[in-house]
A protein has these predicted regions:
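Active-site capping/gating regions of soluble enzymes
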Residues: 1-126, 132-140
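Acidic, glycine-enriched catalytic cores built around paired aspartates
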Residues: 130-198
Length: 198
């Protein structure tokens, strides 16, 4: 959960009593920045091969995965990537426990501040259950299917290169490519069981 306060800690810049769902224009620009760069930030927020098994998990018997698989925001909607649970704050639901906590926070700031600086528009909120009805939403962007797709998006992102610095992005992408290559070069039990007789 996050909000943005002034230096005194007394004014929440994300709160506006007259704003939709109690959020300010600044908060919506921040959300839009996070949505804009979410796919490129996946390699940082979801840095392991197994992260993408969580993101793209099938719906459980409860009707949810508790992990978003598309790039969207909504009110008190646990099927969206960004949730607005109450006035003056947002919940970012994409990140997993494998993320470096410092890079995770830096990524939020890079993307959110880019949204504010460029007055990005998040579009209309989605109130549908995206697990059950996501196919009905036209133009809904999906999150990367695997770590390699995420790495490639990180590498191409101007927002991340500007925010983190080109040298960091190059080094990070090189490290993640090395990890992906190591994974791709290993033979899993599933492959042994299902493909060795091909």
């Amino acid at each position: 959960h996050g909000s943005m306060w002034d230096k005194t800690g007394k004014k929440n810049h994300f709160y506006d009593a007259k704003g939709e769902l109690g959020l300010s224009k600044m908060a919506y620009h921040f959300i839009a920045g996070v949505l804009h760069s979410a796919d490129a930030l996946c390699s940082i927020w979801n840095p392991s091969v197994n992260s993408y098994k969580r993101i793209n998990a099938p719906v459980t018997s409860s009707g949810a995965t508790w992990s978003p698989n598309s790039i969207a925001y909504g009110g008190n909607n646990r099927s969206t990537m960004v949730r607005i649970p109450d006035t003056g704050r947002v919940e970012l639901r994409l990140m997993d426990g494998a993320a470096n906590p410092y890079l995770l926070q830096a990524g939020i700031l890079v993307a959110g501040l880019d949204g504010i600086a460029n007055k990005r528009d998040p579009g209309k909120r989605i109130d549908l259950n995206l697990y059950a009805e996501g196919h009905k939403v036209k133009g809904l962007r999906k999150l990367p299917l695997n770590l390699l797709d995420a790495i490639r998006l990180t590498e191409k992102s101007k927002v991340l290169r500007d925010g983190f610095g080109d040298s960091f992005v190059k080094s990070y992408v090189k490290l993640k490519h090395s990890q992906w290559d190591d994974y791709a070069g290993s033979l899993s039990q599933w492959e042994r069981d299902n493909t060795l007789d091909c």
